[in-house]
Amino acid sequence: MADWYQLAQSIIFGLIFAYLLAKLISILLAFKDENLSLTRNHTTQSEYENLRKVETLTGISGETDSLIAEQGSLRGDEDESDDDDWEGVESTELDEAFSAATAFVAAAASDRLSQKVSNELQLQLYGLYKIATEGPCTAPQPSALKMTARAKWQAWQKLGAMPPEEAMEKYIDLVTQLYPAWVEGGSKRRNRSGEAAGPMGPVFSSLVYEEESDNELKIDAIHAFAREGEVENLLKCIENGIPVNARDSEGRTPLHWAIDRGHLNVAEALVDKNADVNAKDNEGQTSLHYAVVCEREALAEFLVKQKADTTIKDEDGNSPLDLCESEWSWMREKKDSN
């Protein structure tokens, strides 16, 4: 009888031990899966941040971030290489330096008295710009008959999966090599308030072997001038045949950019040239949407006086009236009337 009692006791203890061991293994596996999930989520978010960008030239502005046109643009961390000259620089500072460089190149492109830069260097700038603003090339290869488009595609595609931050750094370095004093020249130009803006130092020629590239550069320039608040150069673009409602890759017109950056004088000049105040970007937002979200009351009121529609809805179903959270009396009256 004692033997049976001892055997039963051993079996019970064995079952309890097996249960506890199984429970411990289950807890360890659950912890491992949760940790792996967190790691994957972090990796996905980091990749997303590194691949998001703004696609068009960014103008020189006192603001560190664009409020609407660049609100979804996220930059990854700075390159961690020990020999990187930009190590430790805040992403906003790098963005500002890149914005200044791209604005300089855009301004330079519209000047016919240009310093000639080889096609090879121009293509390098183009490829770096596309990586910095759009990420790795995913576009199909153009036809061999379209020489310029194919050359530009190759310049972009050969950079592979270069991080946007590295592309911005290389772009700035290349512009600095071509014209070491460009930063000083740009600063002097911005500081001359009330004076007529003269040439911005040596400027870069467009790709010379096909006309389409020159037109594309000018269209980029008109958006850059609107962002910078460069009224005279913007008007020169329009006089040279660039449409006042020319759109960038996100469907934004110069008026969108002028409103986004708070340039009332540019907005007035564009409206005088018959700019469409109700033009929509790719997300269905008009310049008035931008003014409302950016809380630029003077610009919003100006647009409304120019017959901007307060009821146009964007892709999310929101009109400027819907988005307006500010206590603007004249806007409240329109809300009440609707």
From Swiss-Prot:
One of its GO terms (biological process) is fatty acid homeostasis. Changing residue 130 to A: Normal arachidonyl-CoA-binding activity. This is Acyl-CoA-binding domain-containing protein 1. Interacts with RAP2-12. Binds to SMO1-1 and SMO1-2. An acyl-CoA binds at residues 126-130, 152, 171. Induction: In roots by lead. Its main location: membrane. Pfam families: ACBP, Ank_2. The gene is ACBP1. One of its GO terms (molecular function) is phosphatidic acid binding. Residues 69-89 are annotated as: Disordered. Coiled coil: none annotated. The chain crosses the membrane at residues 11-31. Glycosylated. In seeds, localized in the outer integument. InterPro entries: Acyl-CoA-binding_protein, Acyl-CoA-binding_sf, Ankyrin_rpt, Ankyrin_rpt-contain_sf, FERM/acyl-CoA-bd_prot_sf. Binds medium- and long-chain acyl-CoA esters with very high affinity. Can interact in vitro with arachidonyl-CoA, barely with oleoyl-CoA, but not with palmitoyl-CoA. Confers tolerance and binds to lead ions Pb(2+), probably by promoting lead translocation from roots to shoots. May function as an intracellular carrier of acyl-CoA esters. Modulates negatively sterol synthesis during embryogenesis and gametophytes development via interactions with SMO1-1 and SMO1-2; sterols serve as lipid modulators for gene expression of homeodomain-leucine zipper IV transcription factors. One of its GO terms (cellular component) is extracellular region. ANK repeats lie at residues 217-246, 250-279, 283-312, 316-338. It is a single-pass membrane protein. Glycans are attached at residues 35, 41, 191. Expressed at low levels in roots, stems, leaves, flowers, and siliques, especially within seeds. Disruption phenotype: Increased sensitivity to lead ions. Proembryo abortion in the double mutant lacking both SMO1-1 and ACBP1 associated with altered fatty acids (FAs) and sterols profiles. Double mutants lacking SMO1-2 and ACBP1 are impaired in seed development, embryo sac development, male and female gamete transmission, and pollen function, as well as altered fatty acids (FAs) and sterols profiles. Residues 94-184 form the ACB domain. It is found in: Cell membrane; Secreted, Cell wall; Endoplasmic reticulum membrane. Keywords: ANK repeat, Cell membrane, Cell wall, Endoplasmic reticulum, Glycoprotein, Lead, Lipid-binding, Membrane, Metal-binding, Repeat, Secreted, Signal-anchor, Transmembrane, Transmembrane helix, Transport.
